[in-house]
Each structure stands twice: as C-alpha cells, then as structure tokens.
Amino acid sequence: MLTKPLQGPPAPPGTPTPPPGGKDREAFEAEYRLGPLLGKGGFGTVFAGHRLTDRLQVAIKVIPRNRVLGWSPLSDSVTCPLEVALLWKVGAGGGHPGVIRLLDWFETQEGFMLVLERPLPAQDLFDYITEKGPLGEGPSRCFFGQVVAAIQHCHSRGVVHRDIKDENILIDLRRGCAKLIDFGSGALLHDEPYTDFDGTRVYSPPEWISRHQYHALPATVWSLGILLYDMVCGDIPFERDQEILEAELHFPAHVSPDCCALIRRCLAPKPSSRPSLEEILLDPWMQTPAEDVPLNPSKGGPAPLAWSLLP
C-alpha cells in the first residue's frame, strides 16, 4: 500500500492570488498589519501579522534587498526574488497541503515582504522534538510521509527545496500535519549537478563535502535520512564533516530494524545507492499501518487528528 496523505485543510476563505508583480509598501499597509517578531533566519526576518479585511492570521517574511541571492522573471516586465517565483510555482493550482502557501508579496525600497499562510497553533519540528524528545515511530512515519509527499509535489513543479531540516517543517498542532516552509535556499530543479549550496551543512550530503557538487534528488534523499533519524532518535546523526563523509550510524535500542534500514538506505554514502522518493514511500517501514499523532496544542483545546494514510 502506498503511504500518502489525504486531502489537507482547505485554503483560508478569501485567500488572494499573488499578483503578477509585487505591490508597494503603501499597498501592504492598506491590506495587512505587521505584528510581533516570530524569528530570524539567514535570508530574512519573519513576523506575525493579519489581513485587515478578515483578520486572517499570516506570517510576513521581510527580506532585505541585499539578502536576495537569486532573481527570476515572473513575466516579460516583472523580475522578483527567486524565492517568490519558487513559491508561486509550488502554489499554482491550489498548491499542496504539505507546502506553505504564498498569499501575497510586496516590494519596498528596502526589500521584499512575503505574506504566507500561518496555521495556528503551530510549532516547527525542531522545537517540537526539543520539547518532546524522540517522537516514536508512529508519529515519525506520519510526518515523514507527509514531508516526502510535499517534496514530490515541489519536484513535480520543477522546484528543489535544498534545505530540508527540522526547522523548516512546521507542525500544525490542531490537525497533526506537517508543512514544508522557507524556500530561501531553493532552486529550479534540473538534472545537472549543482555547485552551490546555501542550506544547512549538517544536512548536506558527503558528495558536497568532498567534491562541492551534488545532484538534486540524491541530495534531497540524504537530507530526508537525516530528518528521519532526528525524528526517531531525538537528534541528528552527524555534526562534523568527517562524520558526514564516514556516514557511520548508531541507533538507540528502541528504533526498529525496519526503520534503521530505511535510514541507512537514505544515508548511503554513494548517491546512486540511495532510494528515490517513490521507493521511500514503498519501503516496508512506511507500509506499517498508520496511527493517530498524539499532539497537545493547548490545555482544554480540541483533540487534534492526524492525517490518515491511504491503504
């Protein structure tokens, strides 16, 4: 049976389609209100906010112009940051429930403001694991399957994320589902090797460490192996470059042989030995019957439901 998330939550009512060109600061202030700081990253700063017409809660990513690493044409007359173009591509036609959606974007004198959906309550997977420790194989399988399906969608739209890690997985605590966020390190998908990498080094594959080049698909699978290890073990397997090159894995006793085997497949030192995304979903460990994800968004809140997996 194929492990695959069911249809995700519907789009917020009245969600606008991003315009072909970014609007200016005055237009932003007429439509949205900027709220408190949520976090800072290498490519921008993220604030809470809301839409004035209906008070829809959103995340607003502010990117200084000098932090834009790549540009892309949206039309014959409009050029935008590559991150906007990538989000536009993965969000076209309703997007995917496992990928964060770009609702709007604006260009200011200082840079760009990206308005993104913001499920509430939510927590990134790094904080979730830090708080709870190893997730157990049931929740890990559920979240991991959703992330793999989200990446499949991105690749089908010609987009490679290039920074798959726990901090870039947002957990919707009410629904028990995972969303891929932050395409700041992303690129257009192609078959030729990539010779640049702006992602997180401890998630990077050995071929990048040794040769400073990699292919999109096996590098993505490597980072998925790191992510799954993090979920079931509570921490990443490698910290130093030499550890990445040696790829020597040690598992706690509670991790099942089937789970260990899938992680070892994903973290094969030779890129051609790693499975495809489709093969990951067909792996015996991924075929284990699904179970609900035990989340606790807040005291007194409704019991969240995990996405089921199709038989």
UniProtKB/Swiss-Prot annotation:
GO cellular component terms attached to this protein's record: cytoplasm
Transmembrane in keyword set: no
PTM comment: Autophosphorylated.
Induction or repression: Down-regulated in response to enterovirus 71 (EV71) infection.
InterPro entries: Kinase-like_dom_sf (IPR011009), PIM1/2/3 (IPR017348), PIM_Ser/Thr_kinase (IPR051138), Prot_kinase_dom (IPR000719), Protein_kinase_ATP_BS (IPR017441), Ser/Thr_kinase_AS (IPR008271)
Residues annotated as binding ATP: 38-46, 61
Expression sites by tissue: Highly expressed in hematopoietic tissues, in leukemic and lymphoma cell lines, testis, small intestine, colon and colorectal adenocarcinoma cells. Weakly expressed in normal liver, but highly expressed in hepatocellular carcinoma tissues.
Domain Protein kinase: 32-286
GO biological process, one term: regulation of mitotic cell cycle
Catalysed transformations (reactions): L-seryl-[protein] + ATP = O-phospho-L-seryl-[protein] + ADP + H(+); L-threonyl-[protein] + ATP = O-phospho-L-threonyl-[protein] + ADP + H(+)
Disulfide bridge partners, by residue number: none
Catalytic residue list: 163 (proton acceptor)
EC numbers for this chain: 2.7.11.1
Annotated region described as Disordered, given as residue ranges: 1-25
Family: Belongs to the protein kinase superfamily. CAMK Ser/Thr protein kinase family. PIM subfamily.
Protein name (record): Serine/threonine-protein kinase pim-2
Species, as recorded: Homo sapiens
Gene: PIM2
